[in-house]
A protein has these predicted regions:
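Exposed loop/turn and edge beta-strand positions of beta-sandwich/beta-sheet ligand-binding modules
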Residues: 83
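Short, intrinsically disordered or compositionally biased N-terminal tails of bacterial proteins
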Residues: 1-12
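Short, contiguous hydrophobic alpha-helices characteristic of membrane insertion segments
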Residues: 11, 67, 118-119
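Alpha-helical DNA-recognition elements
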Residues: 61
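Beta-hairpin "wing" of winged helix-turn-helix
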Residues: 65-80
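Conserved beta-strand segments that form the floor/walls of ligand-binding pockets within enzyme
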Residues: 88
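Amphipathic alpha-helical dimerization/coiled-coil segments
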Residues: 92-119
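N-terminal helix-turn-helix DNA-binding core of bacterial DNA-binding proteins
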Residues: 12-56
């Protein structure tokens, strides 16, 4: 039987909801993944306002977990000669997303819809 503890051990570290949203935005963006487009993608798809700082902190944490990798692009004049930090999802990040989805699907699949109705 898969428990939350064994799930986290299996994935090395569990994914929080916001980490999932950031990873999914990176997948949707297909190559143009850096801070601002990730923020915009999450806002567009969820209707939530997202702080840039929250995305940058999450990207750093996802990189530490080995779920994304990053590199600095070419310098641009509009950034004062600095390059953007691009990110891409790694196979471990894709696997963590799949496992997270499978766990949620199992939890939802076993839930009686009546238990969510207001009393």
């Amino acid at each position: 039987m898969l428990t939350l503890y064994s799930f986290r051990a299996m994935t090395h570290q569990g994914l929080g909801e916001f980490e999932q949203l950031v990873l999914l935005a990176i997948v949707h963006l297909r190559g143009e993944s850096y801070g601002i487009p990730i923020v915009e993608e999450i806002e567009r798809r969820t209707g939530r306002q997202v702080a840039r700082a929250a995305v940058y902190v999450t990207l750093r944490r996802l990189e530490e977990k080995g779920y994304v990798s990053s590199w600095i692009g070419d310098p641009t004049p509009e950034r004062g000669g600095k390059g953007r930090r691009y990110v891409e999802i790694e196979s471990a990040g894709r696997r963590a997303l799949r496992e997270s989805r499978q766990l949620a699907d199992r939890m939802w699949g076993e839930l009686d819809p009546a238990s969510l109705r207001s009393r």
